[in-house]
């Protein structure tokens, strides 16, 4: 409820480290549940996204998820970085949503947009 323009939230797999001081919303019930894509799909119903940040490793290590990101965010600005830079960027997020996802690099930083 406290997400303003340009603020960020992270949706991550179950292995993504949550930076100290960043609130964690832990949805992981068991390996694979809920999935990264299920959680992302629900969040996108209620959030206007201006741009995304994903790790470049996703393209080669998790091509199915990479392809889905390209489809979901076609026309949106995409920040690509290595995984270490991604984790550094997560330190400024308003929250990290931890899923039960167990595929590699299934993580995204969503930058809040505005609806007008």
Regions found by a protein language model. Name each.
Residues 12, 55, 111:
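Conserved residues at the C-terminal ends of beta-strands
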Residues 73, 112-116:
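Short, well-ordered alpha-helical segments in soluble proteins
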């Amino acid at each position: 409820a406290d997400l303003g323009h340009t603020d960020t939230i992270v949706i991550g797999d179950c292995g993504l480290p949550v930076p100290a001081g960043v609130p964690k919303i832990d949805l992981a019930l068991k390996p694979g549940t809920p999935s990264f894509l299920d959680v992302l799909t629900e969040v996108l119903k209620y959030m206007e996204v201006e741009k995304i940040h994903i790790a470049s490793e996703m393209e080669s290590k998790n091509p199915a998820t990479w392809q889905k990101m390209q489809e979901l965010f076609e026309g949106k600005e995409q920040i690509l970085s290595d995984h270490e830079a991604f984790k550094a960027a997560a330190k400024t997020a308003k929250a990290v949503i931890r899923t039960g996802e167990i595929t590699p690099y299934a993580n995204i930083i969503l930058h809040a947009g505005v609806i007008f």
